[in-house]
Amino acid sequence: EDAFVGPSLGAEAINQGYLSMALGLLLVIVFMIGYYGTPGWMANLALFFNVFFIAGVLVQIQAALTLPGIAGIVLTLGMAVDANVLINERIREELHKGKGLLDAINIGYEKALSAILDGNITTVLIGVILIIFGSGSVKGFGVTLCIGLVTSVFTSVYISHILIDWMAKRQIKAG
C-alpha cells in the first residue's frame, strides 16, 4: 500500500517540527535557569550561539531543512544541553570540595571534556555512516546531526567557558 503526503501536509509537519523545537528549547531554557541560575543563563546563551552556527552552516551549504533535519537539530541541541549539565555539575562538585570559583570552573570543564567528546565523537561517527550509506531524508538527518554536533562541542566547551569565566570574573570583581 502506497501513501502520499501532499505539499500542504508536508508544510504542516515542518511547521509542527519548528513549533516542537521552539517549545522544547523554551522548556530547556527555563530548566537551565531555574536549576543552575546564572551559569544556566550562560549555557542558554551558548545554546543560542549553537543554533546560530547551525543555521549559518546550513545556509552556507544551501541545505533545505526537512523534518529529519529538524530532528537532527533537536537531537544535537539535546546533546549540547547534556554537555552543559555535565559541565555545571562538575563545577558544583569542585565548589563543594572548597575550590575557588575560577579554579572550580576550569577543573569542571577539564573533567567534563572527555565525557563530552566521547559522546559526541561516537554520535558523529553514526552521522557519517548515515551520510555515506543513507539516502534522501536519512542522509539529511546525518548531515544536520554532524553539523550540529560539531557546533555543539564548540559552543559547549569553548563559548560557554568564555561566558562562564566572564560571569565569574564579574562576580569576583563585584565582591
Label each PLM-derived region with a short phrase:
Residues 1-22, 171, 175:
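Structural signature of multi-pass, alpha-helical inner-membrane proteins
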Residues 9, 32-36, 57-68, 73, ...:
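Hydrophobic alpha-helical bundle architecture
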Residues 81-84, 88-91, 161:
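Membrane-embedded alpha-helices of multi-pass transport/permease systems
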Residues 41-62, 73-80, 141-156:
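Small-residue-enriched core segments of transmembrane alpha-helices in multipass membrane transport
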Residues 11-68, 132-137:
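Interfacial segments of transmembrane alpha-helices in multi-pass membrane proteins
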Residues 56-57, 93-175:
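Hydrophobic alpha-helical transmembrane segments of membrane transport and translocation systems
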